[in-house]
Amino acid sequence: MTTILGIDVQPTRLGFAVMVDGKPHDCWTTHIDGFPTKIAAALADCPPRIERIAREWPITRFVSHARRYGAVEARLDDAIFGMWPDVDLVAYKPTEWKVRCGLPGNADKARIFAHAVVLGWKPLDQDAADAACIAVAAAASMDEARQVAR
């Protein structure tokens, strides 16, 4: 059984999506307000065994935003490796995960949400929809790697 976790990163919340054996399992959003304890608690809601975690590598234009995202990313990565020390962690820029998920690189929020629903996910908000597409992108890149290995 292959379990993939997709994570959409925002300074005050994280979107999560769990994919099991190539099929949507669950997606949700957790408000963290940047606190490391809330990040660890949010990860505790995830399955105990995960093969790959894919998270968004946010692109920002302003230094203040980069610092906020960077702090959350560092805390998130620390919590991830604290729970799953041997997990395969990848980070995708927004354009990368959109293309790997089957969307144009410049797809807007509405199109991403609609695409997640078409793929079988039931997101309640945009962060969960983004996380779902990130999980699909991670599954696609794992499939590509398997094809190359053959």
Language-model features and meaning:
Residues 1-150:
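Phosphate- and other anionic-substrate recognition elements at nucleic-acid/protein interfaces
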